[in-house]
A protein has these predicted regions:
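Non-cytosolic membrane-interface motifs at loop->transmembrane helix junctions
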Residues: 37-44, 104-109
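Interhelical loop segments of eukaryotic multi-pass membrane proteins
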Residues: 29-37, 99-103, 135-137
Length: 137
């Protein structure tokens, strides 16, 4: 296809989040492994986060060609790093709640907060760029 590199990255993040959402949804129907992942509301939030992210990056992939400021690897790579951090911490939290790992939940909350703040900073930067783009004549 004739899609630019940055749009491909944004679309890849969208597809990865959607696949994660699909896997999480399918786990709900397998009782033998459901207890590993879906033990508390924090872990169930995986799918809701993934759904929002997949739509967000699908939209970014459609408009990234016309917003040149977003065509920097640091935006997409930073957000992908933060997103993967959130998913990994939430997965580890699920294993801890299931009793498979012994990690203090306070440490997991700290990591989750750090990755969440990083994600929020990226979204704020994206909104600022979008506002500046809309205000241009």
């Amino acid at each position: 296809s004739n899609i630019q590199t940055y749009a491909k990255k944004a679309l890849l993040i969208s597809i990865m989040a959607l696949l994660f959402l699909d896997v999480e949804g399918n786990i709900m129907f397998i009782p033998e492994i459901r207890w590993l992942f879906h033990r508390n509301d924090l872990v169930i939030a995986h799918a809701h986060v993934a759904m929002g992210i997949s739509v967000f990056f699908m939209v970014i992939s459609m408009f990234i060609n016309s917003i040149k400021e977003l065509q920097k690897s640091i935006y997409l790579n930073s957000y992908l790093f933060a997103l993967l951090g959130i998913f990994i911490v939430l997965s580890i939290s699920g294993f801890t709640v299931a009793g498979l790992l012994n990690i203090p939940s306070q440490n997991l909350w700290i990591l989750r907060t750090i990755f969440g703040c990083f994600t929020f900073i990226f979204i704020s930067a994206f909104i600022q760029i979008g506002i500046k783009h809309l205000l241009l004549p």
